[in-house]
């Protein structure tokens, strides 16, 4: 697994803009492996000094976010990452969580994150909400 993360570091470190490559690889890896392997891979890759690899790991965390411990890690740890690109992926991963459990069921978590003292945690929700306003649930329930 360490070798795989090192190969991701070599591959992703040259990417300066966007996140599509990281997102595509994370989705492929998620679909190709069991959740325990992906969980270990996500935590290992999040330790990387290469922010693009941390972005990849945050996409993986998004796919695993039904797990309360993963969701708490996103809220409490990933939100402290100093790289703004990782923060953008945090917003996408929060959206993924809401999509997985359903936007209506996600409302208590949305409220919880909006009350968080960390501005990046709140930002993850509000960035996503700009996109979510087009989702059927939010169109039907604008309040």
Predicted feature descriptions by range:
Residues 1-143:
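Alpha-helical scaffold domains
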């Amino acid at each position: 697994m360490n070798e795989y993360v090192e190969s991701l570091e070599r591959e992703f470190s040259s990417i300066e803009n966007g996140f599509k490559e990281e997102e595509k690889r994370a989705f492929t890896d998620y679909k190709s492996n069991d959740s325990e392997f992906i969980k270990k891979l996500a935590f290992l890759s999040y330790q990387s000094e290469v922010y693009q690899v941390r972005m990849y790991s945050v996409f993986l965390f998004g796919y695993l976010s039904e797990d309360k411990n993963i969701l708490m890690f996103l809220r409490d740890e990933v939100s402290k990452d100093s790289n703004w690109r990782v923060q953008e992926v945090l917003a996408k991963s929060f959206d993924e969580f809401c999509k997985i459990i359903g936007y209506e069921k996600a409302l208590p978590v949305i409220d919880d994150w909006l009350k968080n003292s960390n501005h990046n945690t709140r930002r993850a929700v509000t960035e996503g909400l700009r996109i979510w306003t087009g989702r059927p649930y939010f169109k039907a329930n604008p309040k």
